Amino acid sequence: MDHRLLEIIACPVCNGKLWYNQEQQELICKLDNLAFPLRDGIPVLLENEARALTSDESKS
């Protein structure tokens, strides 16, 4: 994931900062506890495509 892209994209739900989870290949919004998938290296920033983080994932 290009760090320059992370600087300009935001969570589509709250407009908050997204964090890259390299292991899961997801962009994480810690404010909304959502994980947005990457498909072929392209972020899918659609609320209906996001998954809710588990309570363990939210803590880390």
UniProtKB/Swiss-Prot annotation:
Coiled-coil region(s): none
Disulfide bonding pattern of the chain: none
Top-level taxon: Bacteria
Cellular component GO terms held in the UniProt record: cytosol
PANTHER family assigned to the protein according to its UniProt record, in alphabetical order: PROTEIN PREY, MITOCHONDRIAL, ZGC:162634
Xref: NCBIfam families: PRK11827.1
Protein family membership: Belongs to the UPF0434 family.
Protein name: UPF0434 protein YcaR
Organism the protein comes from: Salmonella typhimurium (strain LT2 / SGSC1412 / ATCC 700720)
